[in-house]
A protein has these predicted regions:
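Glycine-rich portal/gate segments that line the openings of hydrophobic small-molecule binding cavities
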Residues: 2, 34, 44-96, 109, ...
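Hydrophobic ligand-binding cavity/cleft-lining segments
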Residues: 1-50, 159
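Structural motif
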Residues: 16, 79-81, 104
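Hydrophobic beta-strand positions in extracellular immunoglobulin-like domains
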Residues: 15, 62, 114-116
Length: 159
């Protein structure tokens, strides 16, 4: 009666820093709760990857400003760091997130293409009426990530 709901939400971040440092931070999802704690409640590695990290899987417990929590797994399926990598999501969210980084002077440009669907009943029921709210929730979460990433880069630079 209520079909799965799909989302494709691109995000663009601009931070002061080098893409090598950004990629190093973003390639350690188990540290997300420390600097992106408004969204990532816990991230635990459940499977190590190969020498390039391919196959590494993490269990994620996350939230936004809406009153629900998500449990999902992220697996690194492509790795061309520091310029791009792809994570496959399963669980409450199913799909892919593709990170693409480029350097422009002292600015790191980070593009994230999040393309997922959810079979979760809550999303299937609410999406026809409140899709814009759910997209806004994701944008809020990503804005927290951009601010947290900039702060983490500054922290590392001062260390």
């Amino acid at each position: 009666m209520f079909p799965a709901v799909s989302f494709r939400i691109p995000t663009a971040w601009r931070v002061q820093g080098r893409i090598e440092d950004v990629a190093d931070i973003l390639s350690k999802p188990e540290e997300f709760p420390r600097w992106w704690g408004e969204v990532y409640l816990s991230v635990t590695t459940t499977k190590p990857g190969d020498a390039q990290g391919i196959g590494q899987t993490v269990a994620v417990h996350s939230k936004g400003w809406l009153p629900y929590r998500l449990n999902w797994q992220g697996t690194l399926v492509e790795n061309h760091m520091p310029t791009s990598w792809t994570v496959e999501a399963t669980g409450d969210l199913v799909g892919r997130g593709i990170w693409t980084l480029s350097q422009h002077g002292d600015t790191a440009e980070i593009d994230y293409d999040w393309s997922v669907r959810s079979d979760r009943l809550l999303f299937r029921v609410l999406a026809p009426l409140l899709r814009w709210v759910m997209v806004s929730n994701h944008r809020w979460a990503m804005a927290k990530g951009e601010r947290g990433l900039q702060a983490e880069l500054a922290r590392r630079a001062g260390a």
